[in-house]
């Protein structure tokens, strides 16, 4: 029994899945953004899932899966939040390569930035170490 009296408990998040449009061009854009810019290596999808398209990126416990949606529409509100070391440098690199970053309304004590992935999905970026912390 858990501390709240339930026989079950959600322990953690295994991965985040974002949608993407179909096609090899989209996969190349995803790899350029998630591996090239964010530094999360692409990993092979299990063979039984590979025919669905999309791509997976993993580093340590961070897992981001991009799944193909034929009728793709980007997630404008729902989003993952990535903890980033060297956030200022990343934002500079993103801006230089045509991915505008925007400062979010701060939650007290937690500065946040947003960027859209190549498909328009919102991604939140927060620093590893908060200023003064």
Q: What kind of region is each of these model predictions?
A:
Residues 8, 55-56, 71-72, 104-105:
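Short secondary-structure boundary/capping segments
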Residues 1-31, 78-80, 133:
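N-terminal beta-strand motif that seeds the catalytic metal site of vicinal oxygen chelate
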Residues 42-44, 65, 100-103:
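A short linear hydrophobic-aromatic micro-motif
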Residues 2-24, 58, 69-94, 96-133, ...:
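Vicinal oxygen chelate
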Residues 49-53, 74-76, 107-111:
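Short acidic/glycine-enriched loop/turn segments that link adjacent beta-strands
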Residues 30-32, 93-97:
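Short amphipathic alpha-helices in soluble, non-transmembrane regions
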Residues 17-62:
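Core segments of cupin and vicinal oxygen chelate
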């Amino acid at each position: 029994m858990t501390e709240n009296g339930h026989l079950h408990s959600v322990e953690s998040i295994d991965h985040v899945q974002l949608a993407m449009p179909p096609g090899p061009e989209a996969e190349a854009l995803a790899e350029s953004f998630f591996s090239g810019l964010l530094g999360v290596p692409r990993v092979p999808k299990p063979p039984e899932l590979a025919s669905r398209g999309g791509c997976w990126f993993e580093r340590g416990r961070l897992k981001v899966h991009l799944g193909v949606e034929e009728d793709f529409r980007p997630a404008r509100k729902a989003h993952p939040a990535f903890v980033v070391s060297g956030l200022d440098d990343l934002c500079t690199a993103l801006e230089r390569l045509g991915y505008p970053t925007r400062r979010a309304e701060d939650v007290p004590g937690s500065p946040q930035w947003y960027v859209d992935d190549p498909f328009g999905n919102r991604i939140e970026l927060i620093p590893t170490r908060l200023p003064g912390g």
